[in-house]
Amino acid sequence: NWPMIINAKQFGLKGEHKWADTRAMQKALNYAKKNKGTTIYVPQGEYHIRKPLVIYEATTLLLDDKAILKRCGKDTLLKNGRRFKSYYGYNGNSHIHIAGGTFDMNGYDYPYNNTTMCMGHACDVQIVDVTFKDVVGGHCLDACGVNGLYINQCKFLGFNDPDGTRFFSEAVQLDIQVSGAFPKFGATDGTITKNVIIENCYFGNSETPGMQPWNRAIGSHASRYHKYYDNIHIRYNVFENMKQYALTPLKNKNTYIHHNVFKNCEGGIRFLAVKDGKNAKDMKGNERGTQAGNNLNIFQNQFIGEMRKEAIRIQSYNNIKHENIVIAKNEFDHESQSVYLKDIKHLYISNEADIRFKKVNID
């Protein structure tokens, strides 16, 4: 039973034709839905997509290096579920592999807030060698309730926030299925993203007029009581000119951030607990109080250039402490860089004397 490879051209792909291209791509994806394990090859060319493409179980989307899927509409480019279908836990469309090419949100011509790829309620999502471009307001990837996310050799280029209201937007959002977090589809059942590797990627600007580098590269801004982003590895990436903290994990467990380069970013890594409010609610809606993270390892990163915010900021609240924090063998090269550490139990720091440290409430 050999895996089947089909060429999207067989389904009527024309190039620079939003009606034909969208229809052909979805027909190919529907064929793969019926024939699990299919690889869809998208040849060199620019293909215009007017409404969201839906990718189903066990589908590989393989784009030529010179293939571009260009958004010509207001919505997302690719999602792994349908709007009114129910998906629970990690049991939605899974084993989705995407490789090569460019997913261009075309934010200059279509300045509408949305996210390039929406992956929810899934396991085993792999994205390799893809360029994401020119997002307005949203994310390159919203991984919401994904168990097993692998991102390698990708580029995340160009972001715009015309209203100034999306300062918290990350290129890659690690997310939890709660109300308001993931409007595309699926049950808001608290399914959280875990088991993640993001490596060998570049985050920066595109050459498109009006675009900027990302505010944040990778992070989370939603949580719930007793829910933790877990087993997250961010390594061998370059973050250039990020407009805020490049990495913003929220109440993670077992996080490894190493061998990254932070170049001329506003700030480096911010690791927060959840203090109160909706992120401290349980799944029944009752507010339960502060929770902190555990086992954060930040080592062998390079921080280059002026930073107006801290190179590393780790903070909790209400005397609830993060536990088991390691900061070792990082390089800091500018006198503006600093480290702020508050509310930590079991902190290990290697001899990084060449940087300003502020420590509050550490045991």
Regions found by a protein language model. Give the residues of each.
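Parallel beta-helix/beta-solenoid
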Residues: Y56-T59, D64, N93, I98, ...
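Intrinsically disordered, low-complexity Ser/Thr- and acidic-rich flexible linkers and loops
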Residues: Y87-Y90, G164-R166, V178-T191, G219, ...
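Short glycine/acidic-rich loop motifs that flank beta-strands on beta-rich extracellular proteins
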Residues: G37-T38, I49-P52, D65, K70-T76, ...
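Acidic Gly/Asp/Thr-rich repetitive segments characteristic of extracellular carbohydrate-active
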Residues: A8-P43
